[in-house]
Design a protein with these regions (language model features):
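Extended, charged catalytic domains and RNA/DNA-binding interfaces, predominantly
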Residues: 1-176
């Protein structure tokens, strides 16, 4: 069950400290961190300072964020359950009209001189992914959803050999 007392930066930093001491380090990328934004520059649940703290705490674990939102087919769906009162659907399921996607990417990624540029300018090895998760395809005649098939809309290419470890190493090194 969801426990809002655990959804804090302190809890995240404790988890990162634990994860950072595992024998095999996993990869962690923030999942659509500006989907909760209320305006351009008003980030919502995930603040830039938190992303910096998490990266500082575990730079070999916390590697970046999904900068291209999922649910890219939201504007194409015929499923009325995903539309607002005006009959509109929002790209990437970024539902606040004051904080839309920008060219298919969220504001933390898309704004020149913005957050991602700042992170790179600070010398951080902080990467952007374009996810291809797919829950329900927008053209499904029975259960139309908000998604394209994996890889149908956007992809993250990794310079890697065709093995799991090589792909993970490429993601860690930013060869994407």
């Amino acid at each position: 069950p969801e426990d809002p007392t655990r959804n804090t930066s302190t809890s995240a930093l404790k988890a990162l400290a634990f994860i950072n001491n595992l024998p095999r380090l996993p990869l962690l990328f923030a999942n659509h961190p500006s989907r909760s934004a209320t305006a351009i520059g008003a980030y919502g649940l995930d603040e830039p300072s938190e992303l910096r703290h998490y990266h500082d705490a575990a730079p070999n674990v916390y590697h970046g964020m999904e900068g291209a939102p999922g649910h890219q087919a939201a504007t194409l769906t015929t499923n009325e359950n995903f539309r607002n009162d005006a009959g509109d659907s929002h790209r990437g399921y970024y539902t606040n009209p004051d904080a839309p996607t920008l060219g298919g990417f969220d504001q933390m990624t898309a704004i020149v001189g913005g957050l991602w540029d700042s992170l790179l300018g600070e010398g951080r090895r902080f990467w952007i992914l374009a996810s291809s998760d797919s829950h329900m395809h927008y053209a499904d005649p029975v259960r139309p959803g908000l998604d394209f098939w994996p890889g149908e809309f956007h992809k993250t290419y990794a310079w890697a050999m065709p093995t799991y470890n090589s792909v993970l190493d490429s993601l860690r090194a930013g060869r994407i």
